[in-house]
Amino acid sequence: MKHSLFIVFFLCLGSFASAQQLTSPDGNLSLEFMEQADGVPAYRLDYKGKPVLTSGRLGLLTEEADLTRGFKQTNLERASVDNYWNPVWGEYNRVRNHYNEMTVTLEQPETGRILNIRFRLFNDGLGFRYELPLQRKMNYLTV
């Protein structure tokens, strides 16, 4: 029985190993990035511990490549920004730019294609974008 519990513990540990966490500067928003079955990138967003998005799948489907599955995480970078910028027009003459950032680098081992997903969590929202670094196996894409 102890041996079975030990095996179950390590199987569960492995399923959480690929999950990455990011929180907003005030700690109210929490994002979890994970790889689902078949290397499908996904994320979850909580506000004050309650789910806002339970499972959002990520990726790009193009005419040239399927960038929605078959990924392995190869790198992770984090950053925090807290500065101000001055808009040219609008209600405010100074705007605070305050967020925590996480960039996840994914690679498809079968194709060698690389996709970066950059998440930014502000106190009042989430933004993310796909970045396709220059690479031999992908000269152009039609989305």
Model-identified regions with their sequence ranges:
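Sec-dependent N-terminal signal peptides
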Residues: 4-14
